[in-house]
Curated annotation (Swiss-Prot):
This is Maturase K. Its main location: plastid. Keywords: Chloroplast, mRNA processing, Plastid, RNA-binding, tRNA processing. Usually encoded in the trnK tRNA gene intron. Probably assists in splicing its own and other chloroplast group II introns. GO terms for molecular function: RNA binding. It is found in: Plastid, Chloroplast. Signal peptide: none annotated. It comes from Pereskia aculeata (Barbados gooseberry). One of its GO terms (cellular component) is chloroplast. The gene is matK.
Length: 509
């Protein structure tokens, strides 16, 4: 961010939200290059190692030349890798990456200034960004709540909705026109936002721009939920992967009433936001609204949310995208955990003179359980086991060194143990570790044309140590494994505040 402030003179451009001139600045594409663009894309001459402003200008000019972008029947061959279709996608990739960097610059600086002004209030902002900070909040608050709304956030069907949302913040008509033109011409967008996994998984190409636009859309939607204020302020930063999620949240806390002045119909629900037992959290495209209120109150919330999406965002949300459940009878499927509130009976024997009696005290406990079946499915998809969970060898890794193979398997095992460390029942994780250990052994045995038993006998205990987490190694040195204290530490849930995303097995290679 210091590089942005060093290179960009914002007093003339971004203070009036004029982004279009920045598109023609060469260093912008240098920043975009650092975020994953192909090195050869923006080079005028591969030997010069300089980004060419001429190429950027040519690309924008070609985008506005309709005849150049329309594919004719003569160029419809799918095997023509260097044909017009490849060039068209290449142009869009370059412009989208550059545009995404540009629109993020002013929002990034606003966030920095906001954090600097309120540094004393949010000292632990780095830790609070962790997605694991949601679960301590659940443990603290959900024990006293009754009902929960599980909400699947609708996505905009029409591209113009995204442009109109951004229009309130970006006053530069040229930039908006370029964005609109780009979205309408990029044919893969429709398939991107209509697939089942569109909320959580974005296309590898042009990911930055689409993630920015979706986050901006969600940011506007979540402006009505800033009633969280101080009681759940540590959840401000539990977002799913982009800068924009946290930008305006801090400022909006001080302007609660202004959020609801856009229509008279929503002023009547202000009293709902003042409810101290109403809490909202979100990860990716799923959000949860929990309350201590009655079922009637939650049905009102469902009605208000559907009407809000329709009136303010022109989004049609089907009622089945919002589920009302009672916490005591239903488990939340959230962030790869099954979370529930269950009652534990604590029997106390009381003796008074000659009479004795038993007192049964029900105690509420928040449980988090690993979703073992989807996790095994992920391992099967990554070719560590079959669909039944039986370990198999990772054939694509047999060309690696033995140390690299063991390190890769051990890293995946430690990452999964790290993420699911908060589970109340860790027995299911032992099955995952078993699959990875045996898959690693099968891979090494296949490489050396040996048997698994012979290979494990040769490696011994050193092989298993690669699959231990750092916490397990430390505890094994301090406490004996069979002691009651050690068993409690091994089995007890604990959460980390350095986890910012769910581990993806498919991308670990």
């Amino acid at each position: 961010m210091e590089e942005f402030q060093r290179y960009i003179e914002l007093d003339r451009s971004w203070q009036h939200n004029f982004f279009y001139p920045l598109i023609f600045q060469e260093y912008i594409y240098g920043f975009a290059y650092d975020h994953g663009l192909n090195k050869s894309i923006l080079l005028e001459n591969a030997g010069d190692k300089k980004y060419s402003l001429l190429i950027v200008k040519r690309l924008i000019t070609r985008m506005y030349q309709q005849n150049h972008l329309i594919l004719s029947a003569n160029h419809s061959n799918q095997n023509d890798f260097f044909g017009h279709k490849h060039k068209k996608n290449l142009y869009y990739q370059i412009i989208s990456e550059g545009f995404a960097v540009i629109v993020e610059i002013p929002f990034s600086l606003l966030l920095i200034s906001s954090l600097g002004a309120k540094e004393k209030k949010i000292v632990k902002s780095h830790n609070l960004r962790s997605i694991h900070s949601i679960f301590p909040f659940f443990e603290d608050k959900f024990l006293h709540l009754n009902y929960v709304l599980e909400i699947l956030i609708p996505y905009p069907i029409h591209l113009e909705i995204l442009v109109q949302t951004l229009r309130y913040w970006v006053k530069d008509a040229s930039s908006l026109h370029l964005l609109r033109f780009f979205l309408y011409e990029y044919r893969n967008w429709n398939s991107l936002i209509t697939t089942q996994k569109s909320i959580s998984i974005f296309s590898k190409r042009n990911q930055r721009l689409f993630l920015f636009l979706y986050n901006f859309h969600v940011c506007e939607y979540e402006s009505i939920f800033v009633f969280l204020c101080n009681q759940s302020s540590h959840l401000r930063s539990t977002s799913f992967g982009a800068l924009l999620e946290r930008i305006y949240f801090y400022g909006k806390l001080e302007y609660l009433v202004k959020v609801f002045t856009f229509t008279k119909d929503f002023r009547v629900i202000l009293w709902l936001f003042k409810d101290p037992f109403l809490h909202y959290v979100r990860y990716r495209g799923k959000s949860i609204l929990a309350s201590k209120g009655t079922s009637l109150l939650m049905h009102k919330w469902k009605y208000y949310l559907i009407n809000f999406w329709q009136c303010h965002f022109s989004l049609w949300s089907q009622p089945r995208r919002i589920y009302i459940n009672r916490l005591s009878k239903h488990s939340l499927d959230f962030m790869d955990f099954f979370s529930s509130v269950r009652l534990n009976s604590s029997v106390v024997r009381s003796q008074m003179v000659e009479n004795s009696f038993l007192i049964d005290n029900p105690i509420k406990k928040f449980d988090t359980i690993v979703r073992i079946i989807p996790l095994v499915g992920s391992l099967a998809k990554a070719k560590f086991c079959n669909v039944l969970g039986h370990p198999i060898s990772k054939s694509v890794w047999t060309d690696l060194l033995d140390s690299d193979i063991i390190d890769r398997f051990g890293r995946i095992c430690r990452n999964l143990s790290h993420y699911y460390s908060g589970s109340s029942r860790k027995k299911s994780l032992y099955r995952i570790k078993y699959i990875l250990r045996l898959s690693c052994a099968r891979t090494l045995a296949r490489k050396h044309k040996s048997t698994v038993r012979a290979f494990l006998k040769r490696l011994g205990s050193e092989f298993l140590e690669e699959f231990f987490t750092e916490e397990e190694k430390v505890l094994s040195l301090i406490l004996p494994r069979d002691s009651s204290i050690s068993r409690g530490l091994y089995r007890g849930p604990f959460w980390y505040l350095d986890i910012f995303c769910i581990h993806d097995l498919a991308n670990d290679e």
